[in-house]
From Swiss-Prot:
The gene is hh. Its EC number is 3.1.-.-. Its main location: nucleus. It is found in: Nucleus; Cytoplasm. Belongs to the hedgehog family. One of its GO terms (biological process) is progression of morphogenetic furrow involved in compound eye morphogenesis. This is Protein hedgehog. It comes from Drosophila sechellia. GO terms for cellular component: endocytic vesicle; endosome; extracellular space; nucleus; plasma membrane. CDD domains: Hint. Interacts with shf. Keywords: Autocatalytic cleavage, Calcium, Cell membrane, Cytoplasm, Developmental protein, Hydrolase, Lipoprotein, Membrane, Metal-binding, Morphogen, Nucleus, Palmitate, Protease, Segmentation polarity protein, Signal, Transferase. The record marks 323 as: Essential for auto-cleavage. GO terms for molecular function: calcium ion binding; cholesterol-protein transferase activity; morphogen activity; patched binding; peptidase activity.
């Protein structure tokens, strides 16, 4: 059987490609006919314009296909961090221990749930921002009888609903129990996110305390910004404010962070240019030099919250919370990619060995946070980059290195096709041409398009929310 006959979009793509080729050929023929009497300079400029038009059409077609294709896959064929497309493999989840918090930071830091914004009362203007949660898979104790325990911020509701589903999967017949959410009676001291609807205390419906360590872990996986196994009687979870600027939208490094060029020179990311070959990493963890093909985000003035990862070898990586960082799993001898704000102390990251030049695991000994000026997100052809000697992905927000790399395929194709353009040298020789790095200020249009479409084609569990 012909493969195209069973895949409708493949036939459509073939027809579109043929149509595109015909248009380019027709355009080329007309251009050739009209240029018989034209000067050599005019013919050269027409050839350049014609080649760029065909290239633009082809790139648009490939980009459209790669955006549409994910919609045709069932979410059941999901992929975990760094495992590529295919069958989902369950990963081991370890329960939290009593008094453990994730992240291991103060609840009110920017890398956790963020600062307090003020008590919300029933007569407060912000009270209308609280939303009721009527999820039938969640039990609400509601001791006050006012329905206050059902009120919470939008983000808290989203995470709680995800957790409720996880609880039913983990323990069939057991439901999530919420013992406290928004509090209007000041039962939690002077400072508490309960007063803002950004915190919940939870347990399981059977009150089995042996489950609470795993319940806390499930809360972390559900996306709560700060989780504490605070007591043997319950778990405490909180989230960032709905009104806060989302620090996880972008995946970037600081401009002062450095990359190693193929020449052996270290260069600040803020000074990198398209075409620079920097130290990167292959899919199997080998060091390799790869070309910078674009900047997914570049803004030297923007203030941003960053996570800082300190290793026992002295390396320090400063990166935004939603950025993927390579993590070595010694038990399974596998390399995975994990969101920076979910890396914990004792996790192992890959760091360049000064003597051998190879990437070796080093243990994370400290996880901190910092607010700094400027963001830079270079994209290499390999999809990875070694920054401050620590191996990291070029991608963020989506918890799969392979899926994100696949999504940027049109940009790699465009870069390759541009290198084949016969007029490339002539165009670049013009004194008016400025490097893309100098021109760009903000998010690259293609990266921005992918970010917007992800909410429609990817399940929430695949995203950093």
């Amino acid at each position: 059987m012909d493969n195209h006959s069973s895949v409708p979009w493949a036939s459509a793509a073939s027809v579109t490609c043929l149509s595109l080729d015909a248009k380019c050929h027709s355009s080329s023929s007309k251009s050739a006919a009209s240029s018989i009497s034209a000067s050599p300079e005019t013919q050269t400029m027409r050839h350049i314009a014609h080649t760029q038009r065909c290239l633009s059409r082809l790139t648009s077609l490939v980009a459209l296909l790669l955006i549409v294709l994910p919609m045709m896959f069932s979410p059941a064929h999901s992929c975990g961090p760094g495992r590529g497309l295919g069958r989902h493999r369950a990963r081991n989840l370890y329960p939290l221990v009593l008094k453990q918090t994730i992240p291991n930071l103060s609840e009110y830091t920017n890398s956790a749930s963020g600062p307090l914004e003020g008590v919300i009362r029933r007569d407060s203007p912000k009270f209308k921002d609280l939303v009721p949660n009527y999820n039938r898979d969640i039990l609400f104790r509601d001791e006050e009888g006012t329905g206050a325990d059902r009120l919470m911020s939008k983000r808290c509701k989203e995470k709680l609903n995800v957790l409720a589903y996880s609880v039913m999967n983990e323990w069939p017949g057991i439901r999530l129990l919420v013992t406290e959410s928004w509090d209007e009676d000041y039962h939690h001291g002077q400072e508490s996110l309960h007063y803002e609807g950004r915190a919940v205390t939870i347990a399981t419906s059977d009150r089995d305390q042996s489950k609470y360590g795993m319940l806390a872990r499930l809360a972390v996986e559900a996306g709560f910004d700060w989780v504490s196994y605070v007591s043997r009687r319950h778990i405490y979870c909180s989230v960032k404010s709905d009104s806060s600027i989302s620090s996880h939208v972008h995946g970037c490094f600081t401009p002062e962070s450095t990359a190693l060029l193929e020449s052996g020179v270290r260069k600040p990311l803020g000074e990198l240019s398209i075409g620079d070959r920097v130290l990167s990493m292959t899919a199997n963890g080998q060091a390799v030099y790869s070309e910078v093909i674009l900047f997914m985000d570049r803004n030297l003035e923007q203030m941003q919250n960053f996570v800082q990862l300190h290793t026992d070898g002295g390396a320090v990586l400063t990166v935004t919370p939603a950025h993927l960082v390579s993590v070595w799993q010694p038990e399974s001898q596998k390399l995975t990619f994990v969101f920076a704000d979910r890396i914990e102390e004792k996790n192992q990251v890959l760091v360049r060995d000064v003597e051998t030049g190879e990437l070796r695991p080093q243990r994370v000994v400290k996880v901190g946070s910092v607010r700094s000026k400027g963001v830079v997100a270079p994209l290499t052809r390999e999809g990875t980059i070694v920054v401050n000697s620590v191996a990291a992905s070029c991608y963020a927000v989506i918890n799969s290195q392979s899926l994100a790399h696949w999504g940027l395929a049109p940009m790699r194709l465009l870069s390759t096709l541009e290198a084949w353009l016969p007029a490339k040298e002539q165009l670049h020789s013009s004194p008016k041409v400025v490097s893309s790095a100098q021109q760009q200020n903000g998010i690259h249009w293609y990266a921005n398009a992918l970010y917007k479409v992800k909410d429609y084609v990817l399940p929430q569990s695949w995203r950093h929310d």
